[in-house]
């Protein structure tokens, strides 16, 4: 029997990434087959030919963007030494960048932008600051530590980050962990981790995110949203906080559960609190309140509890 501990003072949630965009199962399978076919059988073709084969007959801009996103995150690796050799990716052909197959966020964003352009998608490259970015430098008059993209789908701009979507960099170097969390991110989610000094798309103005508030938001805030928290609640909580963590992670089964309803407070207030989680994996889930273990009631795949803090 699996038991998940939900701590009372700081909610400890596994970061089970939810799909950023949902396709019907049969459509997803068809796109996946197309992607795998082009990657496995068309490797000898040049980039333009592979892109045409990848997107030929695709009418949906969302599907085109997804195919390109997946192509980039599955092909390129994060490699700072290679990035130093490349320098400005704009001075290299797409063929050369694909042959090298790696680099920094500048390479990822440049390749993504050029492929979006070739596919007829309206897209932009964004220079700004990101929560996990390092080595902040001045780009013109703006502080910059990361580069990403935005693409317009059905009249709305969405954040796309192929760098973070490709995987993570740890002590052992780059580990490929493809994720859809960074594809077509909703604006209210993107503002938790990305700050565009120019606010080109009005995301920060819409949600009242200033530079000072952005600095307060903890790095894990976006992952709390990935686990199921409402991004607006996370953002509102940070307006009065000091940047305390929202999420704590420990050994878990990735994607094991989804948050349906939970407080987004660093410290629980003395009023009834409703917890509702959904999981096909865990048989039992509990809240630890002081020295008490309080079991959530299970009905089907839903675990729920109304908690009255002492």
Model-predicted regions and their roles:
Residues 7, 145, 271-273:
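Residues at beta-strand starts and edge strands
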Residues 13, 114, 140-141, 266-268:
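Sterically constrained small-residue positions within well-ordered secondary structures
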Residues 1-2:
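N-terminal secretory signal peptides that target proteins for export/translocation
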Residues 110-190:
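Hydrophobic/aromatic-rich core segments of domains that either
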Residues 170-310:
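Alpha-helical and coiled-coil interaction segments, frequently adjacent to or embedded
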Residues 5-16:
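Bacterial N-terminal signal peptides
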Residues 23-104, 110-113, 119:
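Secondary-structure boundary elements
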Residues 17-22:
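Sec/Tat signal peptide C-region and signal peptidase I cleavage site
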């Amino acid at each position: 029997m699996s038991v998940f501990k939900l701590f009372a003072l700081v909610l400890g949630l596994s970061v089970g990434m939810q799909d950023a965009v949902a396709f019907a199962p049969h459509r997803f399978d068809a796109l996946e087959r197309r992607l795998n076919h082009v990657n496995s059988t068309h490797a000898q073709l040049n980039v333009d030919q592979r892109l045409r084969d990848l997107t030929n007959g695709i009418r949906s801009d969302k599907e085109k963007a997804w195919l390109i996103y997946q192509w980039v995150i599955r092909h390129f690796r994060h490699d700072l030494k290679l990035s130093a050799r490349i320098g400005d990716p704009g001075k290299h052909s797409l063929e050369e960048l694909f042959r090298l197959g790696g680099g920094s966020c500048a390479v990822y964003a440049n390749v993504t932008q050029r492929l979006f352009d070739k596919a007829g998608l309206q897209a932009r490259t964004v220079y700004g600051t990101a929560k996990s970015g390092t080595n902040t430098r001045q780009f013109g008059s703006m502080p910059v530590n990361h580069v990403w993209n935005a693409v317009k789908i059905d009249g709305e701009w969405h954040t796309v980050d192929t760098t973070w979507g490709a995987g993570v960099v740890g002590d052992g170097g780059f580990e490929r962990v493809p994720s859809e969390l960074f594809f077509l991110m909703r604006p209210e989610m993107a503002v938790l981790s990305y700050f565009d000094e120019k606010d080109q798309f009005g995301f920060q103005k819409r949600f009242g995110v200033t530079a000072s508030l952005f600095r307060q938001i903890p790095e894990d805030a976006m992952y709390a949203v990935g686990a199921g928290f409402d991004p607006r609640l996370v953002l509102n909580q940070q307006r009065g906080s000091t940047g305390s963590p929202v999420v704590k992670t420990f050994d878990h089964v990735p994607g094991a559960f989804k948050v349906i309803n939970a407080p987004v407070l660093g410290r629980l207030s003395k009023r009834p609190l409703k917890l509702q989680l959904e999981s096909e994996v865990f048989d039992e889930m509990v809240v630890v309140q002081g020295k008490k273990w309080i079991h959530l009631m299970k009905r089907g795949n839903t675990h729920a509890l109304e908690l009255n803090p002492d």
